[in-house]
Swiss-Prot record:
The family this protein is said to belong to: Belongs to the archaeal Rpo6/eukaryotic RPB6 RNA polymerase subunit family.
Name of the protein in question: DNA-directed RNA polymerase subunit Rpo6
Pfam families: RNA_pol_Rpb6
Entry-linked InterPro entries: DNA-dir_RNA_polK_14-18kDa_CS (IPR020708), Pol_omega/Rpo6/RPB6 (IPR006110), RPB6/omega-like_sf (IPR036161), Rpo6/Rpb6 (IPR006111)
Keywords for this protein: Cytoplasm, DNA-directed RNA polymerase, Nucleotidyltransferase, Transcription, Transferase
Family matches, as HAMAP family: RNApol_arch_Rpo6 (MF_00192)
GO BP: transcription by RNA polymerase I; transcription by RNA polymerase II; tRNA transcription by RNA polymerase III
EC number(s) from the headed UniProt entry: 2.7.7.6
Amino acid sequence: MGLERDGILSQDLHFNEVFVSLWQNKLTRYEIARVISARALQLAMGAPALIDINNISLTDVISIAEEEFKRGVLPITIRRRLPNGKIILLSLRKS
């Protein structure tokens, strides 16, 4: 019984490592929604846009925040805490 349990634990650990490596540089839909809503709030409170909004037909703050996110100009870093205690920092700014 102990050997079966060790085999299952090692498979679970391997699965967790693969899962973490796959999702390490991707954002979840909830993280994306949180970033866009936080940036839209900043824009609504008077923060300057990080893209030139004169050349595009975007007028509402959510569309502007989405466009800034798509272009990768947001100076925001996501701190993701993993179940094993590790912390991963994901920068949204594309170089």
